[in-house]
């Protein structure tokens, strides 16, 4: 990002979407039950895991304690995490961990302004 003084500072954006997100519990055409949430996460994971044979993939799950933290919903997340942990070559982490990893593996190299 170019700053007002003309210098350049790194700016990393970790993808976030409403696809695998508990906000869909409060949207029309969203999740009605924890089972719907679990099945959607599992199907998404299975597709990405298969695609990951060729190149790394990332699955971001948006969670909000006021939504997913309900007694009838939190079990679906626990079941999903158990399912994912049964697979090899999977890293379960927080968004900040993804950002730190990206910055370490792909350090910022400023490009020439106007190039």
Residue ranges and their predicted role:
Residues 35-115:
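C-terminal domain-boundary segment and adjacent tail
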Residues 1-55:
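Active-site-adjacent pocket scaffolds in enzyme catalytic domains
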């Amino acid at each position: 990002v170019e700053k007002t003084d003309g210098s350049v500072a790194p700016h990393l954006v970790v993808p976030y979407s409403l696809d695998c997100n508990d906000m869909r519990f409060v949207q029309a055409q969203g999740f009605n039950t924890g089972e719907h949430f679990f099945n959607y996460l599992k199907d998404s994971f299975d597709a990405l895991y298969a695609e990951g044979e060729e190149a790394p993939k990332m699955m971001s799950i948006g969670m909000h304690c006021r939504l997913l933290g309900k007694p009838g919903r939190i079990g679906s997340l626990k079941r999903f995490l158990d399912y994912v942990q049964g697979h090899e070559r999977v890293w379960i982490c927080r968004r900040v961990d993804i950002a730190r990893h990206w910055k370490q593996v792909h350090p910022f190299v400023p490009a020439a302004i106007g190039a």
